[in-house]
Amino acid sequence: MPPKKKKLAGLIKLQIQAGQANPAPPVGPALGQHGVNIMEFCKAYNAATESQRGNVVPVEISVYEDRTFDFKLKTPPAAKLLLKAAGVAKGSGEPHKTKVASVTMDQVREIAKTKAEDLNANDIEQAAKIIAGTARSMGITVQG
């Protein structure tokens, strides 16, 4: 007989700084209510994201009924990557009136390549259009 498949008890989605997960909120309470060993997750996450320090890395944690877990790392949010590329701290308060920065189409394509696996697009050009739309809604102009 094949081994029994674990039954999923919950799915937790978090955005945590790479290599900086600790039991303090938001990580502790989110995992605690599902009965997951918080320190075990923090150590595993920090080890997995060590190379991406400085970025916010979203994570999807699958918690099973026997209180074990596994997690899938996603790519950093497009907005964070755009802010980094543009060299600004935050987007515009009124994006269609005040522009805060600008990025080149090459930078947008680079971000699209990074995000390609998480985006709902068939090729890099479509992914770049999605990223350009995000930039526009943040008050960042795309040149080229």
UniProtKB/Swiss-Prot annotation:
It comes from Rhodococcus erythropolis (strain PR4 / NBRC 100887). One of its GO terms (biological process) is translation. One of its GO terms (molecular function) is structural constituent of ribosome. Belongs to the universal ribosomal protein uL11 family. The lineage of its organism: Bacteria, Bacillati, Actinomycetota, Actinomycetes, Mycobacteriales. GO terms for cellular component: cytosolic large ribosomal subunit. The keyword Cell inner membrane does not apply. InterPro entries: Ribosomal_uL11 (IPR000911), Ribosomal_uL11_bac-typ (IPR006519), Ribosomal_uL11_C (IPR020783), Ribosomal_uL11_C_sf (IPR036769), Ribosomal_uL11_CS (IPR020785), Ribosomal_uL11_N (IPR020784), Ribosomal_uL11_N_sf (IPR036796). Disulfide bonds: none annotated. Coiled coil: none annotated. Forms part of the ribosomal stalk which helps the ribosome interact with GTP-bound translation factors. It comes from the Bacteria. One or more lysine residues are methylated. Part of the ribosomal stalk of the 50S ribosomal subunit. Interacts with L10 and the large rRNA to form the base of the stalk. L10 forms an elongated spine to which L12 dimers bind in a sequential fashion forming a multimeric L10(L12)X complex. This is Large ribosomal subunit protein uL11. Keywords: Methylation, Ribonucleoprotein, Ribosomal protein, RNA-binding, rRNA-binding. The keyword RNA-binding applies.
